[in-house]
Amino acid sequence: MYKLWLLFDPRRALVALSAFLFVLALIIHFIALSTDRFNWLEGKPAVKAA
């Protein structure tokens, strides 16, 4: 496993991984915001009263 870090610079690899995960989280949240069920910004109640 240590030979992997001889091929890649650990700082650049961890920065790239962090940037990728941040962008992935943004994409997931924007997809959730585009649905009616998970759009928490519109102000609609989550569960309608019976």
Swiss-Prot record:
GO MF, any single term: electron transporter, transferring electrons within the cyclic electron transport pathway of photosynthesis activity
Classification via Pfam families: LHC
Sequence positions that bind a bacteriochlorophyll: 29
Residues in compartment: Periplasmic: 34-50
InterPro entries per the UniProt record, alphabetical: Antenna_a/b, Antenna_alpha, Antenna_alpha_CS, Light-harvesting_complex
Topology of this chain in the membrane: Single-pass type II membrane protein
Keywords for this protein: Antenna complex, Bacteriochlorophyll, Cell inner membrane, Cell membrane, Chlorophyll, Chromophore, Light-harvesting polypeptide, Magnesium, Membrane, Metal-binding, Transmembrane, Transmembrane helix
GO cellular component: organelle inner membrane; plasma membrane; plasma membrane light-harvesting complex
Subcellular location(s) of the protein: Cell inner membrane
Transmembrane segments: 13-33
NCBIfam families noted in UniProt: pufA_517_ASD
Subunit structure: The core complex is formed by different alpha and beta chains, binding bacteriochlorophyll molecules, and arranged most probably in tetrameric structures disposed around the reaction center. The non-pigmented gamma chains may constitute additional components.
Function in brief: Antenna complexes are light-harvesting systems, which transfer the excitation energy to the reaction centers.
Protein family according to the UniProt entry: Belongs to the antenna complex alpha subunit family.
Protein's name according to its UniProt entry: Light-harvesting protein B-880 alpha chain
Organism: Rhodoblastus acidophilus (Rhodopseudomonas acidophila)
